[in-house]
């Protein structure tokens, strides 16, 4: 079973004291302010064999998301909606404690949070993925791979997922005596993405709240809270991780900070996606 670096790494006390001493001065090891995000870059259409893909680099954290569309049956409780299935894998090359094999509880949690943020925000209009109501719909497989774990992988997974969905091609559907089939030679459009969604994570280290923690900062954090936002700044997901606790005042302060960061992050995401 894999362990995330924040659970596995033990930074020597002297290094923690050094990091916290920088927080006292309002700065960090990489020169950022406490509320600054690391540099973000998004490369679209990175995996040519996928129907849509995006490579996200957030500092040293690197995540690849890819999509595949296939004709399928709708779920019984949502006969007039397409299906979205999110998977996350922590690849062994991403960090020394990650092991090969089926997704562990950390990967499953990441997938669940990303899935919930996409669904609750209605970022993807699943009703427009219906081919024949109650019988045939598009199933969107969204596979997310953590290639390099440099901290704050959840935010990067959300960014990569949204970018890959935005970049996903929809092919022509043809019908014959055997039913529906996909004509991969003809693209009819892209996935009906209503709007982007972003996740902003805030870590608490001693008395300090820091945005977008890197690997060292996650290794010494007490706890972390992540907020997912739509462009109108509606909260569509909250996730706490880490063994420590946050007071109501901490949570309120963290959300106020995350909201301000989300505005800038959404602008940057839209810019890089060209929307």
Curated annotation (Swiss-Prot):
The keyword Phosphoprotein does not apply. It holds the Pfam family RNase_PH_C. One of its GO terms (cellular component) is cytoplasmic exosome (RNase complex). GO terms for molecular function: mRNA 3'-UTR AU-rich region binding. It is found in: Cytoplasm. One of its GO terms (biological process) is rRNA catabolic process. Its main location: cytoplasm. Keywords: Cytoplasm, Exosome. InterPro entries: ExoRNase_PH_dom1, ExoRNase_PH_dom2, ExoRNase_PH_dom2_sf, Exosome_comp_Rrp42_subfam, PNPase/RNase_PH_dom_sf, Ribosomal_Su5_D2-typ_SF, Rrp42_archaea. Component of the archaeal exosome complex. Forms a hexameric ring-like arrangement composed of 3 Rrp41-Rrp42 heterodimers. The hexameric ring associates with a trimer of Rrp4 and/or Csl4 subunits. Non-catalytic component of the exosome, which is a complex involved in RNA degradation. Contributes to the structuring of the Rrp41 active site. Belongs to the RNase PH family. Rrp42 subfamily. PANTHER family: EXOSOME COMPLEX COMPONENT RRP42, EXOSOME COMPLEX EXONUCLEASE RIBOSOMAL RNA PROCESSING PROTEIN. This is Exosome complex component Rrp42. The lineage of its organism: Archaea, Thermoproteota, Thermoprotei, Sulfolobales, Sulfolobaceae.
């Amino acid at each position: 079973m894999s362990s995330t670096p924040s659970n596995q790494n033990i930074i020597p006390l002297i290094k923690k004291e050094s990091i916290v001493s920088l927080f006292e001065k309002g700065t960090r090891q990489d020169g950022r302010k406490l509320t600054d995000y690391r540099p973000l870059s998004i490369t679209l259409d990175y995996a040519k064999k996928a129907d849509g893909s995006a490579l996200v680099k957030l500092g040293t954290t690197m995540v690849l998301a890819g999509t595949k569309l296939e004709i399928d049956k709708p779920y019984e409780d949502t006969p007039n909606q397409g299906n979205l299935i999110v998977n996350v894998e922590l690849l062994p090359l991403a960090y020394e404690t990650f092991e090969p094999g089926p997704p562990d509880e950390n990967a499953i949690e990441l997938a669940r949070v990303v899935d919930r943020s996409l669904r609750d925000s209605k970022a993807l209009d699943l009703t427009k993925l219906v081919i024949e109501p109650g019988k045939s719909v598009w199933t969107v497989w969204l596979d997310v791979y953590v290639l390099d774990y440099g901290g704050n992988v959840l935010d990067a997974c959300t960014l990569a997922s949204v970018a890959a969905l935005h970049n996903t091609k929809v092919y022509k559907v043809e019908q014959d005596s055997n039913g529906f089939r996909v004509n991969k030679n003809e693209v009819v459009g892209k996935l009906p993405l209503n709007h982007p969604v972003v996740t902003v994570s805030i870590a608490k280290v001693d008395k300090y709240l820091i945005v977008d923690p890197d690997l060292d900062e996650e290794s010494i954090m007490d706890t972390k809270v992540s907020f997912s936002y739509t462009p109108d700044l509606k909260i569509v997901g909250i996730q706490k991780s880490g063994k420590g606790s946050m007071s109501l005042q901490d949570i309120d302060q963290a959300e106020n900070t995350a909201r301000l960061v989300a505005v800038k992050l959404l602008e940057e995401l839209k810019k890089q996606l060209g929307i």
